Each structure stands twice: as structure tokens, then as C-alpha cells.
Amino acid sequence: MKYRLIGVGASLVVAVMLTGCQAKATTLVKSDAGQVTQAEVFKQIENQATTQQAVQELTLNKVLNQRYHVSQAEVTAKLKAFKRQAGANYHMILERNHVTEPRLKSQIKANLLMEKAVSAKYPVTKAQLKKARAAYMPMTTVQHIATTNEKQAQKIIAELNAGASFDSQVRKYQNNRQAHTTAGKLAQFDSYNQTLAPAIVQATAKLRVGHYVTKPVKTVMATADTKDKPTYEIINVVSRRSKTAAVTDDSGKQIDVTNYLREKIQQQRMMDKQTQVATIRSVFKAAHVKVVDAHFAPAFNDYLTTQNS
């Protein structure tokens, strides 16, 4: 699962400032021109967007922490999954977003709390699982040939139709040494893949094992070789796992396909803005959240009804 890091640092800094705002006489800076007090800083920042966001996040985290429990083991598992996805870029990602690992853990915990809130409000039904299972393409291995020339792509397919092997076509039309070494094979992927162009995943799902596309698959993805030019892909399905086979989840753990599909359905819901808003409204209402300081009312406009505020 992906985590949004941008803005986390700023929100946390403001949040720390706000948690101590009751001591309004506290002097933060002294100079010949006078003192800068915490009350002055609070007045300066209270209407800023980052401050509004920080107040909203503090409130949400308090409410969710009271209603749901996230263990340290759960946070650690998600952190390991994030590190595995980021690979060698892990520390660079943190540095670019001005986030330390402890702050990342806090954000992961907040995400997990929200996941549990969404799951509680919108439990996955048998009908939804049945639909997901029917649409699911399990882990599949494909060979591919990519070209920016549509006519050449059509020629490659014509030669395949005439009896040429896919391996020979890879050697003939791909200049990439790695493609020659792997016979054009891509890493295994399923229908939930978010790395490849959606058109490639969709085309693959329609093919049976041992079959290739009858028309080139057009994609537009920036790569070192193609820049932003349209790319025409010829795809051949080499193998496909059973729909009932165990699947490796985001944490690297083997789980049965039903739990995997349930996890994916919930992840998709977490990306849906309307679902998030409805869930937050629900937990705020249950916790009787009320904005006392009118300056912070805008932060809750989407989440509180007139009766609550």
C-alpha cells in the first residue's frame, strides 16, 4: 500500500505547537524589539491551511484511537512493506518529504486506524467478494515486445500469425539486452497491478495462456527509451496461476485469495474520497465532536452537520 508523505512534517510541527497553546504567556523568542509569545504565534497561524489540517488530524486521531486499536506489530508490518516497495529509495523518499521514520510510523498508524474505521462502516460483503473473484486475474507471466512504430507492431503480429515464435520476435525487434536475456518476460503481475499501464493489464486479462494479442496495445508511458511517445505493445501470455492459489500480500505474507481480495477491496475504498468523508462524519458524530473555537470551524465543514457544530 502506498502512503502519502507530503505535508506530514508541516502538519506535525503545527500540531505540536497547538497542543501547548493553552500556555499563552509562554515566550518563544526574545529580542531588543520585544518578545514573541506563543499566543502571538497562535494568532498568526490559526487561520492557515496547515493549522486547520493539523487540528482536524489531531481530532480524528483522538477519536479513532479511542474507538480502534492498532498494535505495534501491525505498524511494523506495514513499515516493512513500505520499505520493500521503496527499495534503495527509502531514505531518499523520507528526505525529500522531510519525514523521519518515527513520523512515518505515526502516519502509518493513522492510516491503519482509518482502514479499521472504513472496514467497520463498510464491511466487505459476500456479493462483493464474489464479484471481485470473478473479475480477478491471478498472477500472470507475459512476454512483451514494445515499439513506438505502430506499423512495425502490426508487422510483428503478422509474422507471429505466419508462424514466427515469440522468442525469435523478441530477439529480432528488441534492442534491450535484458529483454533478450529474459525473452521479453515481465515480472509476474495480477489484475491489481499499479506499475504497468492499465491497458497492458486489461489486455492480459482477456488472453488465455499461450495466446498473444491480435492488435497492438497502445500505451503512453514515459520511459528512458520512449520518452512520452505512444508505445505499441505485443503481449503473449506464458503462464497464469490458479484463481484459488495463495497470494503474497503487501507485507510479503502468504494469504488465501479470499483474504487477499478483501484486503484489495478495502484498499480501493481507502482511496475513495466520498468513502473517507462518510466514515469521518460517522466517527465524529458518534464521538459528539463539537468545534468550540470558531476559527477552526472551516477544518470541519465537510465532516460535521449543523447539529454537531
Swiss-Prot record:
Which major enzyme category is it? isomerase
Q: Which family does it belong to?
A: Belongs to the PrsA family.
Indicate yes or no for the key word NAD: no
Q: Which domain of life is it from?
A: Bacteria
Subcellular location(s) per record: Cell membrane
Q: Domain PpiC: where?
A: 137-232
Q: In its UniProt entry, what is this protein called?
A: Foldase protein PrsA 2
Q: Does the keyword tRNA processing apply?
A: no
